[in-house]
């Protein structure tokens, strides 16, 4: 944590697992950090950003913060597709906001869907482009060399290549838009920016889709 603050030129941070010490630092505007995520709900902050990507940790931290009447913004789609509706209700019950952050595919795609609907267009398909090769039998060991070359955690890269991340994000998009998945596992064809409208046309028009109003993804020069 200290190194992160130093790299950003923010000086020295107070690192502690003592709530009173952290709250004192917060009160004086001093950067503060902790190794115990489960005390965050006790800190004197208005908004908590949960970005672990770990469903269990995210669920515990987020629910505790909502119960403490703190707004929570998440970059944890893995948690959101699991218990997002429950957390949304908890937030409403406590008069605070629970929201998925802008920046990742589900929310950005949702914004485009809402824009199209505002203009009274029918949404045939919404989704994302996948810029990693689809290797469903990947393991952290098989992608380790590539991951280290990219300064990534092999487990994280594996979740990209084996399709886990894409499937999770598209479930989130389906949940929030009301669109259905095109089929179990989705089609995931190769495409490009110039050919997207042809690839995701209905089958009767030469595309892959058997019906409109679905979520899917593609690979290729689109991301």
Positions of predicted regions on the chain:
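Glycine-enriched alpha-helix->loop->beta-strand junction motifs that scaffold or abut catalytic
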Residues: 44-45, 69-71
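C-terminal catalytic/substrate-binding lobe primarily of soluble NAD(P)-dependent oxidoreductases
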Residues: 145-223
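N-terminal glycine-/serine-/threonine-rich beta1-alpha1-beta2 phosphate-ribose binding loop
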Residues: 1-64
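Rossmann-like NAD(P)H-binding beta-loop-alpha module
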Residues: 91-95, 99-165
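Rossmann-fold NAD(P)-binding glycine/threonine-rich loop
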Residues: 52-68, 75-104, 114-115
